[in-house]
Every structure is written in C-alpha cells, then in structure tokens.
Amino acid sequence: XXSVPAFGHYLPAXP
C-alpha cells in the first residue's frame, strides 16, 4: 500500500 518518494520517483512499498 502506498509508495515512498525516492530519487524523484516513487517506489512500491508495501501494499
């Protein structure tokens, strides 16, 4: 769920 902002883009993090 949700995503985490990383290096100017978003990575999947969990559901």
UniProtKB/Swiss-Prot annotation:
Plasma serum. The keyword Secreted applies. It is found in: Secreted. One of its GO terms (cellular component) is extracellular region. GO terms for biological process: defense response to bacterium. Its main location: secreted. It comes from the Eukaryota. Keywords: Antibiotic, Antimicrobial, Secreted. Antibacterial peptide. This is Salmocidin-1.
